[in-house]
Structure formats: C-alpha cells, structure tokens
Amino acid sequence: MAGQVILIVDDNARNRKLTRDVLEFSGFGTLEAAGGVEGVAMAQEHVPDLVLMDIRMPDLSGPEALKLLKEDSRTAEIPIVAHTSSTMRGDEERFLADGFDGYLQKPISVRELPDQVRGFLRA
C-alpha cells in the first residue's frame, strides 16, 4: 500500500498538517486542500487513491463535494471517507447513507489512522 496518495480536504490547517504528517510517516503520499472547492478540483486533477473529507467547510460542504466527485467519471470510484469532529448520534449512519465510503472521528488517533486508511483502501 506504500506510495498510495491520500487527499486531505479540511479547512483547518492544523488538522491537515497532523493528518499529513501521520500519513506520510506511514509511507503514504498526500495532497492537501483547504476547502471543498479546492478538494474537488484536486481530486479531478490528481485522482488520489482515497479522500479524507471534512464535513463542515465554509465554501462547499463535504456532502456537496462528495456529490460532485461521485458524479464525475474521473473520480466516481475513489473511496471518500467522512472525517469530522461531529459527535451527533446517527452521524456515521447518515454519512454512509449520503454515499461516503466510511467515517472517521476527529481528533485522529495517531496510532490508528494508518491502519484505518489501509482498511478503507482494501474495502
């Protein structure tokens, strides 16, 4: 799995940096986008192996970005994982029903994130 590229879409620079550092230390390549609009454009241009998508972003929400990516033949097959700090009951079920391929709770677990990402890549 080494060398696979993960696109991190999050409007919070600290979250992006921590996620990037953990993934790169584990052998993944990374791309970063500071919002949904930039994330969609980067996914269309680079076609990463997996997208970690924040849900709440000011320019384009995670579910809105997901819809655009799933409608585009270049990006429709990329696994897209909801990556959120929301702790509302039923979130995971709602995100999966919306079409996300998985769900990760923030803050990330530095120990668990690489294995979680590998699991999404194998699914």
Regions found by a protein language model. Give the residues of each.
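Short hydrophobic/Thr-rich beta-strand motif most characteristic of the beta2 strand and flanking loop
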Residues: G27-A34, M42, L104
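Active-site beta3 strand of CheY-like receiver
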Residues: H46-L52
